[in-house]
Amino acid sequence: MKHIAIIFVTSLLASCNLFQKTQPAGESVVVEEAQKQQKEAFVPVEKELYVISHTALRYTVPDIHSDPEEAMNSFGDLFEIEAESEHFYKIKSNWDWYLRKEDMGSYEDIQFTKEVLEDVHFIGKREGDTFVDEEKGTTLSKYFTIDMISYEEYQKAKKNGYFPLVKDTLAIKKKEGILLLPCSDTVVKLKDVEMTPQDDLEVYEYEGEMQPIHQYLIAGYYYEAGDKFLIDKRTGHKTEIESHPYLSPNGKYIITLGVTEMGGATAIALYKVLSKDPFAIELVVSAWIFYWVAYEASKNRPTFFGKDGCLYVAMDALDSYEYNYKEEDKPCKYVRIKIKDRYQ
């Protein structure tokens, strides 16, 4: 009997221990579910904040355990906030949606990471009318080193900046819709064309002279498109380029920057100057930058090459640029772009 009693007690203790071991697991599930079901407590606020992270996600349910609906694709955008909770901001809108508080902040908080600076929609080279893509995953880092710099660094470089474009726009004036460009061997005639059922729109503007390489710079405007091109002052030969050109101080390279044909973020291209007489260039690479856009036409925030051979650019996140590009006194960001040695 004594042995039977001991066995019974031992079995009873084992059963109790088993119950105690399994019970917390059940309780943890209940607690976890309860936590998930806890609602965020929102309080009304009135403020504006930027999307500071390029990985920000949009939520239709303010629950950190729920799956977000989709990526925002609004890096640098400014939103009105109508309420906030511990983890979320409620965006002022006609429908309910939310952003994580960690993804929102002031303009100064916008996070231009290495990935943000270098990422592209696509990158490659035009061969005739075909664009040949680089290997998947290639970014601007293959060709350039891009660093964020301060306003003070930008201004210091600007004092010794290289500005080879002479904007003598009064020297060559359009008359009755016609631009006449005097060259050593010929006269180049560019005539505006009005939009009609038979003809597409064509408008040409003289932007100045790139004296070190003896080229006129012309802007062409067409129906839903535009371009820049060079006219040789000696031969009258036309050289097509991607967008606005910036000649390096040593005259060996041209980088072009400008908004894309679709009005998106900045297009960048690198050319090697093969010869000045006769003038010839070779496209090294062309890309559409994903997240940021240059203030290409800004008078107070010009793009230029410094004496160190780097390109200095005033820029912004695409959505910030759309707010600020008409206001020269608004703050912006600055980058320094260096051509990698293997392409020099």
Summary of predicted features, one role per range:
Residues 198-206, 241-250, 291-302:
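Repeated scaffold domains used in trafficking and secretory/extracellular systems
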